[in-house]
Regions:
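Hydrophobic or amphipathic alpha-helical targeting/insertion segments
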Residues: 84-125
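Glycine-rich, proline-tolerant flexible connector loops at the mouths of alpha/beta enzymes
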Residues: 33, 44-67, 98-106, 168-177
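Catalytic alpha/beta core domains of metabolic enzymes, predominantly
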Residues: 128-129, 137-284
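N-terminal amphipathic alpha-helix/helix-capping segment at the start of soluble metabolic enzymes
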Residues: 1-25, 281
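Active-site mouth loops of central-metabolism enzymes
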Residues: 17-35, 54, 73-81, 137-150, ...
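Alpha-helix-loop-beta-strand connector modules within alpha/beta enzyme cores
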Residues: 58-79, 112-124, 184-195, 279-281
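Glycine-enriched alpha-helix->loop->beta-strand junction motifs that scaffold or abut catalytic
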Residues: 70-73, 91-97, 118-121, 188-194, ...
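Hydrophobic faces of well-ordered beta-strands that scaffold small-molecule active sites
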Residues: 20-26, 51-53, 75-79, 97-99, ...
Length: 347
């Protein structure tokens, strides 16, 4: 969905009608190859489809072949300023480069990177960030406005286009959600390149998920965006889970479990918070295309969750297991979760 142009990062297609892909980034020092590989495997297991790694120096380039050998998902090299790092990353077999051409020096250097990527069919993501806009653009607009982010992205793209390079993905990230949304809308009106969505410096797990859901979700609802990354000050695996939850909430991703639970009220007589959290965690890696409901009381529970394939509703020290709104049987509270999981296994 989203853009008209399609690029390929390894085996993942971005834009041009392809499914929305989920990305994350390693937060292990690039010199710790063993730790980085371990984290990459965890991300792949969680469903991450594209993994980015910071490549701050030549020593870090060694991480790329190690990651390529360890996981099957595409690897992106995140590079700033030094064009030689981009050239070495290409030679090392990276699937995609994140670099801003305007920050790497002369036209000769930009051409060298464009040529190296073109030879190997490696796309380049131009990653504009509200915290690192060019001085000229900041002087023009005064601060990182949506138009400033848009102008910066299109300027960097023009530097690559000058050398007949169009294998481009764009991102215009801001920590301010309205700014981020408007910047992407402006760029989407002016070009057909695939767009990588994200709210930069979104914050801790709680606030980061809220801001990312608002920003990424708003754009996807308007058919803007082709690949997403939820940035959190947390374990990167949680970024992947959050990204998929956003896609499920928008009904973009229809496979896998949809989990619903009620907010509780004075009728609730079981520890619904504990039960709901346990059910959600146990369903984390379930790939069945089902809707599961955990409700607080038997008065409204089965009826309110009639659209669910399977669910439970609390009583007084016990609860009901129901299917498609129809009651199956009653079990003690301590056996509710296991009973629910047993029924899910049968589906």
């Amino acid at each position: 969905m989203g853009s008209k142009i399609q690029v390929s990062a390894g085996n993942v297609k971005i834009g041009g009608g392809a499914e929305i892909s989920v990305q994350s980034m390693l937060n292990i020092p690039s010199t710790d190859i063993e730790g980085s590989v371990r984290q990459a495997k965890e991300l792949e297991k969680a469903g991450c489809q594209i993994i980015r790694a910071a490549i701050p120096n030549m020593e870090a380039v060694k991480l790329i072949p190690a990651l390529k050998e360890a996981v099957s998902v595409p690897i992106v090299a995140d590079i700033h300023f030094d064009y030689k790092l981009a050239l070495e990353a290409c030679a090392a077999g990276v699937d995609k480069i994140r670099i801003n051409p305007g920050n790497i020096g002369s036209d000769d250097r930009v051409k060298a990177v464009a040529d190296a990527c073109k030879t190997r069919n490696i796309p380049i993501r131009i990653g504009v960030n509200s915290g690192s806009l060019e001085k000229e653009i900041l002087a023009k607009y005064g601060h990182p406005t949506p138009q400033a982010l848009c102008d910066s992205a299109l300027y960097h793209a023009s530097l690559l286009e000058k050398f007949d390079f169009n294998n481009i993905v764009l991102s215009m990230k801001s920590s301010t959600v309205p700014t981020m949304i408007k910047a992407y809308e402006l760029v989407a009106e002016q070009c057909d390149y695939p767009l990588h969505l994200g709210v930069t410096e979104a914050g801790t797990e709680r606030m980061g998920i809220i801001k990312s859901s608002a920003g990424i979700g708003s754009l996807l609802l308007h058919n803007i965006g082709d690949t997403i990354r939820v940035s959190l000050t947390a374990d990167p695996v949680k970024e992947v889970y959050a990204a998929y939850d956003i896609l499920k909430a928008l009904d973009i991703k229809k496979d896998g479990v949809q989990f619903v639970s009620c907010p509780t009220c004075g009728r609730t007589r079981i520890d619904l918070v504990k039960i709901a959290n346990e059910v959600e965690e146990r369903l984390r890696n379930c790939n069945k295309n089902i809707k599961v409901a955990v409700m607080g009381c038997v008065v409204n529970g089965p009826g309110e969750a009639r659209e669910a394939d399977i669910g439970i509703a609390g009583g007084v020290g016990n609860g009901l297991v129901f299917k498609k709104g129809e009651i199956l049987y009653k079990v003690p509270e301590e056996k509710l979760v296991d009973a629910l999981m047993d029924e899910i296994e049968k589906l």
